[in-house]
Amino acid sequence: MSRPHFQFETDLAARGYLRIAGVDEVGRGPLAGPVMAAAVVLDPGAIPEGLNDSKQVTAKRREALAAQLAQVAQVGVGVAEVAEIDRLNIRRAAHLAMLRALDALPAPPDMALIDGRDRPDDLPCAAHAIIKGDTKSLSIAAASIVAKVARDRVMTALAAEFPGYGWETNAGYPTQAHRAALLDIGVSPHHRRSFRPVHNILYQEK
């Protein structure tokens, strides 16, 4: 598998874009917890070694890379809570998290590289959507690392408050054990009621 590179950013810099943010989100698929996004502006001279798509990196290495990025890059994190997911739908909530991540950067970017084919409306800057961008752009890969680490920490904290669902390991995703716990324990305040498996339990649909 090819690794992410810095060519998109280099080409854009040659066209005059100086603050290029990679943007990625995590948490569209879980039954519980927020959807989160990160925006990262890399320093071309201080890119952490081994930076890669979060799915290709161990949890321990993700933590180390996120700590490095906090020191050498500009980082913003955005969250859309469960109530917003249920009110807006997951796509719009993910876009809201992306906008909040961009807004959380220390200074506004002039270009955003966004993972996927879809991009939010009302972006504060120019943008390119890149399919499988976390495997192609180092800036997006950095955002995928930051977002994943941030959300895993949130879900671990929620797991301590609401034990039994296994969120510390499944991060809210619909594993067999998580689905079984939903039936056994019931629906928590952090479950997404608009998602069918949760909705069906609440309304006893079979």
UniProtKB/Swiss-Prot annotation:
UniProt EC number: 3.1.26.4
Predominant localisation class: cytoplasm
GO biological process: one example: mismatch repair
All residue ranges annotated as the RNase H type-2 domain in the record: 18-206
GO molecular-function term, one example from the UniProt record: RNA-DNA hybrid ribonuclease activity
PROSITE patterns: RNASE_H_2
Domain of life: Bacteria
Enzyme type, top EC level: hydrolase
UniProt subcellular location: Cytoplasm
Cofactor(s) listed in the protein's UniProt record: Mn(2+); Mg(2+)
Keyword Amino-acid biosynthesis: no
UniProt keyword annotations, A-Z: Cytoplasm, Endonuclease, Hydrolase, Manganese, Metal-binding, Nuclease
Role according to the record: Endonuclease that specifically degrades the RNA of RNA-DNA hybrids.
PANTHER family, sorted: RIBONUCLEASE H2 SUBUNIT A, RIBONUCLEASE HII
Official protein name in the record: Ribonuclease HII
Organism per entry: Dinoroseobacter shibae (strain DSM 16493 / NCIMB 14021 / DFL 12)
Gene: rnhB
